[in-house]
Amino acid sequence: MSSRRSSRGSISEEEINELISKLQSLLPNSRRRGSSQASTTKLLKETCNYIKSLHREVDDLSDRLSDLMATMDHNSPGAEIIRSILRS
Amino acid sequence: MAQCGGGDVSRHRKGHLDTVESLCQGLLDDVMLDDDKCRAMFGYLQEWQDLASMCYGSLGGEPPLAPEASNGSGSSGGGGSFRKRRPDDAKGESNSICKRQRGKQQQQQQPCHPDQMAAAVGKGRPERARPGAKKKAEVASPKDSPATSASTVTAGQKTDYIHVRARRGQATDSHSLAERVRRERISERMRYLQELVPGCNKVTGKAGMLDEIINYVQSLQKQVEFLSMKIAASNPVVNFNIVEDLFGRQLSQAACNPAALPAMALPMAQVEPSCLQMSPLQQMQTSAGSSGYGLEMVVSNQYSPPGGPMSVPAGASVEPCLNVNGAAGWDIGSHGLFSGFDAPFQSVQSDCLLDNLKMEM
């Protein structure tokens, strides 16, 4: 009973370690730290910050895109092309 | 009569038990004359009082004060009995308070122990050890102070030590405590991430949650890249190389991980012809005012050459620049190209480059 539980626990632990290293590879500034595995707490904190910064970036970029679209001359051939890109 | 007064006091002592009170009153009226019966009654009432004080103790409320009860006993003999009964009351009250205080102190000592452990463990965590020291100083005080301050201290401790408190049967050695603190922190962050990531609260288990978080981060990254690509595409000429750069990078990503980017493959495929379309436009639209800086530079370079042979190397060096990854190529190219131009033009160019860089980032 206990051995089965421990083996299952180790598998899930392995899984979690794998997922955590995957998450670490996704983060931009944790890549340079390389093999030295940072603490999970720090990693999760960095993930929080990174998600927040990505949210901000997405908002900023969509604002800029809408601004660009607003200031664009609508019947120029360039705008046509852009609209065809954006429609995709 | 004296015993009657004592009964009265005890009656007021538990004034909220109305039915008991009326019963006692009736009994007292009946047995007032018989001394023995009165004594028996007194013992009965005393039992009841003990019961009532037990009730108070278990409810945790303050029992009504004894001097209030003296209002009801008008007789002089009642005063004597009251004085006789008073030590009992005081003893009972002090007993109950003592019991409660002892309980609090036990509660205080329990969190105090893991705290000392945590202070021993966490040399690198002074923020945890400091409140512990403060609380230890406060723990000493309630031993001779009333129960109210003891309750406030426990309330404060409850908020402070919830992370390091060892429950019954849990190990209290330093490693286990440190591990417990670490796990608490991790689960706290996971909860925070759960709030941050949509749809993550449906998933149970750490592995599923991490999976969801990874997917979300990847999708956000893709979203950012796609948006910057759109912006780059909507500002066509200047950012042509960046579009190409993004395009190439995403293609390589897609080649590495073809199943992961089905959404990106479609827009990319449609971007490609438009980009190809751009290159003839580039030559056609040289006079259009709405085109970007890069075109204007090429145009002005061709129209107003400060040095005669400038236009030929310009055309030759812009082409490789387009293929160079990043803005460094542009920078070098522009410096080499427009060294003969006036300074403001170059600053505009560098602003534009900075913009591109930001977008690419």
From Swiss-Prot, chain A:
Protein's cellular compartments: Nucleus; Cytoplasm
Result of knocking out the encoding gene: Erected leaves with reduced lamina angles associated with lower cells length, reduced internode length and small spikelets and grains. Impaired response to brassinolide (BL).
A GO MF term: protein homodimerization activity
Family annotation (InterPro entries): bHLH_dom, HLH_DNA-bd_sf, PRE
Domain of life (superkingdom): Eukaryota
Miscellaneous information on this protein: Plants over-expressing ILI5 produce increased grain size, caused by elongated cells in lemma.
Assembly: Homodimer. Interacts with APG. Component of a nuclear cell elongation controlling complex made of ILI5/BUL1, LO9-177 and BC1. Binds directly to LO9-177, and interacts with BC1 only in the presence of LO9-177.
Name this protein carries in UniProt: Transcription factor ILI5
Organism: Oryza sativa subsp. japonica
Swiss-Prot record, chain B:
Uses in industry and biotechnology: Plants expressing BCL2 in the lamina joint and the spikelet under the control of BUL1 promoter exhibit increased leaf angle and grain length.
Pfam families hit by this protein: HLH (PF00010)
PROSITE patterns referenced in this protein's UniProt entry, alphabetically: BHLH (PS50888)
UniProt region (Helix-loop-helix motif), positions on chain: 184-220
Biased segments, Basic and acidic residues type: 124-138
GO biological process: gibberellic acid mediated signaling pathway; positive regulation of gibberellin biosynthetic process; regulation of DNA-templated transcription; regulation of unidimensional cell growth
Sequence segments annotated as region (Disordered): 66-160
Protein name: Basic helix-loop-helix protein 79
Organism: Oryza sativa subsp. japonica (Rice)
